[in-house]
């Protein structure tokens, strides 16, 4: 059976969708425009350059605004093609929900891209940002989320400023406030209604859709809303129908089912005299984190073109059947826009690797359990084909449990316990070499042994800050070394962050057609492990990241790549300092320095050492929150 390379099992050809690839030297390259083959940069060389020019300290988050622009073009193009093929006469507007990533660099990159799109806000603070970035050109703005009068007034101000602002009614109590505030401003509001569907997608985010969804109106509440607007002579204000099946939909059938049900709402609202002009299908466009094209939680079984065709065809069929006008289709595809544009590069600060040790046989007077373990060990070499491979491991497990029990009651010494534990590892390692992946019955125990003997890589990052979804909902992200991908798989590894939390580990890794509990790695010197890349972290991760152990935002570099492969760092941020993080929890750095000074003055340190300590403490407050030792 041929030995696979890292490139072959990390699926970069699939999840990278052209933005990320591997060059002939085995380094990961970034290509912001997949059709421009010379517009590439090596992630390793980029990291080295930023470290040299900006004295950047790892970890660094690299962001590629050109990928954002290309994602806009791709999604717009997919819906343009779908509309042409269906003969769809309505328009299309891609709306960016800024909750996915509210960073200024993201919104400004989208607004300056030249690609048509709108913006969505889900809170008062987000609306304030949206109104500012919308600028002087007319922008379609969708206002979701729960609203108070101030939120509503700001939205109506946006309409007065020339934007096309839709206030989506999430609960019935909002409509009265909207009508009252609109009257005060002398403006006719554009209203939308979020319908709560029975349909919902499957996966980690399914609760955001369906009948038990936090948001939206039930069928009876939609009818009540129509009645209220009729009574107020404002039925013509209701122009947008919105629904949401859930984020990261893995199965295209869920998309088709949801569009079909929501199209029925469109038809019925028209029968009630409501002239719906915009059909907002919400989010749901998934990205393939696994690169497997399956309907699992972190993958999708469809392409972007299939998604667009499914949405457009579902709406057009309802319009054709009932002779209704084609509405403008809106999608809120935030994950599809932003996920690929950001990659975190981090260094490994330590490696813990299993090394077989030669052990001497127990002395004749040693306890029986130690002799039993030794007999198992010698039996492996003497009779490999005569017994079940599992039986040797099971016997070792039983004996080791007995060793621990005897140690706990004082019958064995610490040295004897250490000998037994090492011998058990030797037994497992030796037997593990005899298992065959071709035998289905062996696969489970092979996985278990791979996890037991995997290298432990201590990575200079916080899982809670940089990949919170990996911790919170077990989401899988592509992660692999950024060099050596053309080399054969020689080792297995598990990744641990530097927080003081046992949850700070990555448990799932891409492994060809499946998911494994260990990460395939090339051979590498223990004292010089490769840099690691954490990919597709551009959606939600920066915003959801938390301050566990006061690890802060990483350094960030915004990079533009030229057609000749030359790159420019257009913006660089050093990330949070220790002082920044302490201020978040109301620790005043000046007060801390004062207290350091008081302690040093009351100590018996020599003057030179006292001054040195004070300078080091001050430098520590102004330093990076991550480990800085080279």
Swiss-Prot record:
EC number(s) from the headed UniProt entry: 4.1.1.19
* Highest rank taxon of the organism: Bacteria
Q: Matching InterPro entries, A to Z?
A: Ala_racemase/Decarboxylase_C, Arg_decarb_HB, Arg_decarbox_C, Arg_decrbxlase, De-COase2_CS, De-COase2_N, De-COase2_pyr-phos_BS, Orn/DAP/Arg_de-COase
Task: Write out the catalysed reaction.
Answer: L-arginine + H(+) = agmatine + CO2
Pfam families (alphabetical)? Arg_decarb_HB, Arg_decarbox_C, Orn_Arg_deC_N
Question: Which keywords does this chain's UniProt record carry?
Answer: Decarboxylase, Lyase, Magnesium, Metal-binding, Polyamine biosynthesis, Putrescine biosynthesis, Pyridoxal phosphate, Spermidine biosynthesis
> Does the record's keyword annotation contain Phosphoprotein?
no
GO terms in the biological process aspect are: arginine catabolic process; putrescine biosynthetic process from arginine; spermidine biosynthetic process
Cofactor dependence is on: Mg(2+); pyridoxal 5'-phosphate
Q: What class of enzyme is it?
A: lyase
Its pathway is: Amine and polyamine biosynthesis; agmatine biosynthesis; agmatine from L-arginine: step 1/1
- Disulfide connectivity for this sequence is none
Q: Which GO terms label this protein's molecular function in UniProt?
A: arginine decarboxylase activity; metal ion binding
Name the residues that bind substrate: 279-289
Q: Which residues carry this modification: N6-(pyridoxal phosphate)lysine?
A: 99
Q: Which HAMAP family match?
A: SpeA
The task this protein performs is described as: Catalyzes the biosynthesis of agmatine from arginine.
NCBIfam families linked to this entry = PRK05354.1, speA
The UniProt family comment states: Belongs to the Orn/Lys/Arg decarboxylase class-II family. SpeA subfamily.
What name goes with this protein?
Biosynthetic arginine decarboxylase
Which species? Answer: Neisseria meningitidis serogroup A / serotype 4A (strain DSM 15465 / Z2491)
Task: Please name the gene that encodes this protein.
Answer: speA
